[in-house]
Curated annotation (Swiss-Prot):
This is Putative glycerol-3-phosphate transporter 3. It is found in: Membrane. Coiled coil: none annotated. It is a multi-pass membrane protein. The lineage of its organism: Eukaryota, Viridiplantae, Streptophyta, Embryophyta, Tracheophyta. It comes from Arabidopsis thaliana.
Length: 510
């Protein structure tokens, strides 16, 4: 078995059985490179939609499980479910969120390390099916009349591990097929899976809630289990696994430099037969830009996941235009935050490509998050129209940088020039960045569970402070990118060029 610093691959690549099936019905046999790219885009997209859909039931059923939520609940949806129906119900729900997200954060680092060494298709399938089983087991408590707090805690802990497998895998696979030049826009569109998953999960959970809260979990569970099987049958991990040949016209200057995992992976196979080196965990932290973006995402994801887990609950506790909304209506209304997130992710990717500045774009969105949150808290209750507009704007600025950092930025850093094209780092770097962010994601919701009992104003001040710190962490990178825009090539490019003759690449085994 590979150690923490081992660089051995633990698998032999094989063509997915579904690809064999498709090739039998094609006159020319093999699929084209672009067809494989389309397949990868769609499969990874729907896979992570399913992952996020399974996270939404928790936030949707909070008001149903807790009979005595924060504030004076006046809606029609009551009932409660022990042990969450007491005065400390919101705190217990926050602890369950903490258990899930803590294991998710730790598991992300482990999953990323394994993702560069295991068959990504099989590993991703395990994560999806395991997530489906855990999500269903949470809902089974409704029919089995289970009220033990530690049952829910154990299920969410296990679910956190299986969920952590997904992100490093899908980003690594996508990075294997798309070059750096177009990552911003492509991954900006692709990152819509986060918000779409939240929307779909919300609609499924709220639609089934009237039949009993257990169904809110079973629906998304069946979805991700089915899609996990589809992924196993059809997902091509990289061009070599399916013997795909890139058209000469598609190779651009960026790819000739060996920036992408695909090129370095294929070239290494040509020269050595089978390159088994993968970047080590500590070495990945040394890649320029990884640490600042990782800690930036800590605070960015804290804000995003607080909304993910608590927005429907907050809306149900707030009179909008003098009217108290039901749990179902609150859940459906909260999807507008995710609609804004879809637009924000696409805009962030587009602007970052046009400016060639990931940090500038992320920082700009993050700083605009602060007034957006302030306005939503102060004026969101005035009327339904104002609430919708401000919720959309808040979602745009909150999820825009989150989507950019976890996709295009992670893929760029995972194929950084300092690696000199001789190491596999995509899954590891992705895991470091999103794993660090997930620590913040674990802290935000549980803090909200306690702070909301005091005041929702305090919750929003906490979120605005987190956004400010997040933006400040990118200051150095923003300054470097501004200098590059004003004066030409960056200092980093000169350093990398000099390093090619003066020092060896990053030690991939550290």
């Amino acid at each position: 078995m590979a150690s923490w610093t081992s660089s051995e691959f633990l698998y032999e690549e094989v063509k997915p059985p579904g690809i064999h099936f498709l090739e039998r019905f094609r006159r020319s046999g093999k699929l084209s490179f672009k067809q494989y790219q389309a397949m990868v885009f769609v499969l990874t997209f729907i896979a992570y939609i399913a992952f996020h859909a399974t996270r939404k039931p928790n936030s949707i059923v909070k008001g149903t499980l807790s009979e005595q939520p924060t504030g004076h609940f006046k809606g029609a949806d009551k009932g409660g479910w022990a042990p969450f129906d007491g005065p400390d119900g919101t705190a217990l729900l926050g602890q369950i969120d903490l258990a899930f997200l803590s294991v998710y954060a730790v598991g992300m680092f482990v999953a990323g390390h394994l993702g560069d060494r295991l068959d990504l298709r099989t590993f991703l399938t395990i994560g999806m099916v395991g997530t489906g089983v855990c999500t269903a087991l949470f809902g089974v408590a409704f029919w089995a009349n289970i009220h033990a707090f530690y049952y829910f805690l154990a299920i969410q802990t296990l679910a956190g591990w299986f969920q952590s497998i997904g992100w490093p895998c899908v980003v690594a696979v996508l990075g294997n097929w798309f070059d750096k030049k177009r990552r911003g826009v492509i991954m900006g569109v692709w990152s819509a899976h986060t918000s779409l998953g939240n929307i779909i999960g919300t609609l499924i959970a709220t639609g089934l809630l009237k039949f009993g809260w257990g169904w809110s979990f079973v629906g998304p569970a069946l979805l991700i289990t089915f899609l996990g099987i589809v992924v196993y049958l059809f997902l091509p991990v990289n061009p070599h696994a399916v013997e795909a040949e890139r058209d000469g016209s598609e190779v651009d200057s960026t790819m000739r430099l060996g920036d992408t995992i695909t090129e370095s992976f294929l070239s290494s196979r040509t020269s050595t037969g089978f390159d088994r080196r993968a970047v080590g965990f500590l070495a990945a932290w040394k890649i320029p830009g990884v640490a600042p973006f990782a800690f930036c995402l800590f605070f960015t994801k804290l804000v995003s996941y607080t909304f993910l887990y608590w927005l429907p609950f907050y809306v149900s506790q707030t009179e909008i235009g003098g009217e108290q909304l039901s749990q179902e209506t609150s859940g459906n209304l909260s999807t507008l935050f995710d609609v804004g997130g879809v637009v924000g992710g696409i805009l962030a990717g587009y602007f970052s490509d046009q400016l060639d500045g990931r940090a500038i774009t992320a920082g700009g969105f993050i700083y605009l998050t602060i007034p957006a949150l302030f306005l939503y808290r102060i004026y969101g209750h005035v009327s339904m129209t104002i609430n919708i507009i401000l919720m959309f704007v808040a979602g745009l600025f909150v999820n825009g940088p989150y989507a950019l950092i976890t996709t295009a930025v992670a893929a760029d850093l995972g194929t950084h020039k300092s690696l000199k094209g001789n190491a596999r780092a995509l899954a590891t770097v992705t895991a470091i960045i999103d794993g660090t962010g997930s620590v913040g994601a674990a802290i935000g919701p549980v803090l909200t569970g306690y702070i909301a009992a005091i005041s929702w104003d305090a919750v929003f001040y906490m979120l605005m402070t987190a956004a400010l710190i997040s933006g400040l962490l990118l200051t150095t990178l923003i300054i470097e990118e501004v200098k590059t825009l004003l004066y030409g090539s960056s200092e980093e490019d000169h350093e990398v060029a000099a390093a090619s003759t003066s020092r060896p690449p990053i030690d991939v085994l550290i």
